[in-house]
Amino acid sequence: MAGPCGWIASQGNFWWPAAYVPPLLIVLSTALAYTIRLGLMTLRASRELARLPRVPVPPNLVRNAQAAGIDRIAYVGAGSPVAFCAGLTRPTVFVSEGAVATLSEPELLAVLYHEADHARRHEPLRRAARTAAAEVLTFLPIVGWWSERQIARSELSADAAAERVVGRSALAGALLVMTAPAIPLAAFVGHAELRARRLLGMGIDEPKPPRAVWAATFVYSWLALSLAGCLFEVVVALRP
């Protein structure tokens, strides 16, 4: 590997393993940053969830949650119609009082089956891992693009699971009623426009990463490796 510092050629045969040091430094520092970022995201989400005003779950919600295969359900005292799945190790479906009061029985079931699919697939953990990776690997724009694409796929998959049970009409009605929560989690209304296109029978093309994303990923990766090489050259030069 030859970066702008040209440090490899200056090390001689004895230092040939040094060629692996810059990539290793990037991997280790990225892994550390990723672990810290994921931990901070988990801590923040836990604090936000702890602040939610929880109230006893009404019998009809318990019954519908059991029908949807939801093991853990939480009832939130909020007037806005909100539902989301949260919890990295023990996914829990949160439903607000406003959602139960506003939605019809089939629409409520559509929401519950949608969120049950997220819980079954451990979507909160997957989404947190992808988001943390995209934020840490900012020099790899392709990671952010891939993360957003996977989130969209998970929403479409959850919709398909709900539609198979309650039908398209109930799912569409729920999508019109529900709102987004303040916490950036696996909420029911995520990627609403894309999901509406599917419900309307409109074609959804499988997007490909733009060339600009690939180009930026290549350039930023090269710059990161070159910078790591330069830093390593400085360390080698300063060694006794």
Ranges and model annotations:
Residues 1-75, 205-240:
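Hydrophobic or amphipathic, alpha-helical segments that drive membrane association/targeting
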Residues 50-57, 142-206:
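Short helix/loop segments within enzyme catalytic domains
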Residues 93, 128-144:
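Hydrophobic, aromatic-rich membrane-embedded alpha-helical segments
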Residues 95, 114, 158:
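Divalent metal-coordination and catalytic microenvironments
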Residues 96-110:
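Short pre-active-site segment immediately N-terminal to the catalytic Zn-binding motif
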Residues 109-113, 117-121, 185-221:
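Membrane-interface, cytosolic juxtamembrane amphipathic helix immediately N-terminal to a transmembrane helix
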Residues 116-133:
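Catalytic Zn2+-binding segment of zinc metalloproteases
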